[in-house]
Amino acid sequence: MVFELIRPAPLTEQKRSRDGCIYLYRAMKFIGWLPPKQGVLRYVYLTWTLMTFVWCTTYLPLGFLGSYMTQIKSFSPGEFLTSLQVCINAYGSSVKVAITYSMLWRLIKAKNILDQLDLRCTAMEEREKIHLVVARSNHAFLIFTFVYCGYAGSTYLSSVLSGRPPWQLYNPFIDWHDGTLKLWVASTLEYMVMSGAVLQDQLSDSYPLIYTLILRAHLDMLRERIRRLRSDENLSEAESYEELVKCVMDHKLILRYCAIIKPVIQGTIFTQFLLIGLVLGFTLINVFFFSDIWTGIASFMFVITILLQTFPFCYTCNLIMEDCESLTHAIFQSNWVDASRRYKTTLLYFLQNVQQPIVFIAGGIFQISMSSNISVAKFAFSVITITKQMNIADKFKTD
C-alpha cells in the first residue's frame, strides 16, 4: 500500500503516539528542517536548508514586491488580485515558517513526552485508540498535502494555458513575453519556488492539528481510566489510591505537553488570524468580479487552502475544551463516596486542577476557538462591502 500509515495498523504491531507525526517529519526532512547531527552530510544538508529559506521564504515575498515596482501597469485587475492575495499570504507564511523553524525543538521535545504517556497505554482498547489517532493524524497531513499541492498545480496550469505566468514574480533574467518557451520556463521556475513555499506553509499549518489530535486521544484515554477508578473489586484501597495518583501524573504530563507546544502554536495561529480576513476578502473579490473559469478554479482551491489553515485546528480546540469538561464529570461521577479520606483529598486536588480547561491563546491576546476564527474571517465580507460601496471593481474594469 502506498500510504500505509493512513489506515490503523493491526494490534499485532506496536505503534506509538509519535508515529502520528511520521509524514509531517518526513516533509520537514525533505524541505531541510532536520539536518543530520554530524558528519559531512550535515553541511551538505545545511546548504539545502539555506537554499530553501533563500528562495522560498525570502525571495518569494520580495519577488511579489519587485514585480509590483517594475511592471504594475501590465497587470490586469484579475491578475493583480490573484498575485496580491498570494503575496499577502506569502509574507504571513514567511513569519509562520520562521516561528515554527526557530521553535522546532519544542515540537521534537513534545514527542518525548508522548513516549512517557504511551507507557501507560497497556490495555488493548488504549492501544487501539493510539493506532487510530496515528492513522488519523497522518491522514490529516495527507489531506493538507493534496489540497496545497492542488492549489499550486491548478494555478500553474490555468495561468500558463491562459498565456501568463502563474504569480508573475520579479525575474530580471527571463522575460516571459519573449515567446512560449520563455513563458513555460519562467512559469516552471515560479512553480518550483512556490511549491517549496507551499510545503513550508503546509508544515506550519498542519502541525497544530496533528499535535492536538494526539492530545485529544490521550485526554480520552485518561477519562476512561478515571471512570474505572475503584471499579475493580480485586484491588485494595491502597492499590486504588495508586491508580488515582497515576491518573494525576498522567494529567500533569498532558499539561507539560501543552505547555511545550503552546508558544509555537500561539505565534503561528496569531499570524494567520491577522491575515485570513484580508486574504479571503481579496480572493472573493477576484472570484466575483474578475475571474474566468480557470482563474476561478485556482482561486477556489486557494480559498480551501486558507480555510484549512485555521478552521480544523480551531474546531479541535473547541473539542479539547469539551474533553476537559468531560474529565471533570468523570472525576465527579467516579466511585469515590466510600473511599478513604486520603483518596478523597487527592481526588479533590485532582478535580480542582482539571477544572482549568486547556486553552490556546493566539499571540497572548485572544482565545483560539471557532468563534474567534469566524470573527476574524468575517473581515472578508467587510472588504467585499467596501469594494462594492466604493465601486472599486467597476473602476478597475473601466481603467
Swiss-Prot record:
Query: Where does it mainly reside?
Result: membrane
Signal sequence annotation? none
Q: In which tissues is it expressed?
A: Expressed in olfactory sensory neurons in the antenna.
Residue ranges annotated as Cytoplasmic topological domain? 1-45, 105-140, 200-268, 314-356
Instruction: Provide the membrane-side ranges marked Extracellular in the record.
Output: 67-83, 162-178, 290-292, 378-399
Membrane topology according to the record: Multi-pass membrane protein
Q: Which residues cross the membrane?
A: 46-66, 84-104, 141-161, 179-199, 269-289, 293-313, 357-377
Q: Identify the Pfam families for this entry.
A: 7tm_6
Q: Name one GO cellular component term.
A: plasma membrane
Keyword terms, alphabetized: Cell membrane, Membrane, Olfaction, Receptor, Sensory transduction, Transducer, Transmembrane, Transmembrane helix
Q: Which GO terms describe its biological process?
A: detection of chemical stimulus involved in sensory perception of smell; sensory perception of smell; signal transduction
Summary of the function given for this chain in its UniProt record: Odorant receptor which mediates acceptance or avoidance behavior, depending on its substrates. The odorant receptor repertoire encodes a large collection of odor stimuli that vary widely in identity, intensity, and duration. May form a complex with Orco to form odorant-sensing units, providing sensitive and prolonged odorant signaling and calcium permeability. Involved in the behavioral responses to ethyl acetate and pentyl acetate.
Assigned protein family: Belongs to the insect chemoreceptor superfamily. Heteromeric odorant receptor channel (TC 1.A.69) family. Or2a subfamily.
> How does this polypeptide assemble, per the annotation?
Interacts with Orco. Complexes exist early in the endomembrane system in olfactory sensory neurons (OSNs), coupling these complexes to the conserved ciliary trafficking pathway.
Any other comment in the entry? The atypical heteromeric and topological design of the odorant receptors appears to be an insect-specific solution for odor recognition, making the OR/Orco complex an attractive target for the development of highly selective insect repellents to disrupt olfactory-mediated host-seeking behaviors of insect disease vectors. Odor-evoked OR currents are independent of known G-protein-coupled second messenger pathways.
In Swiss-Prot or TrEMBL terms, this protein is called: Odorant receptor 42b
Question: What is the species listed in this Swiss-Prot or TrEMBL entry?
Answer: Drosophila melanogaster (Fruit fly)
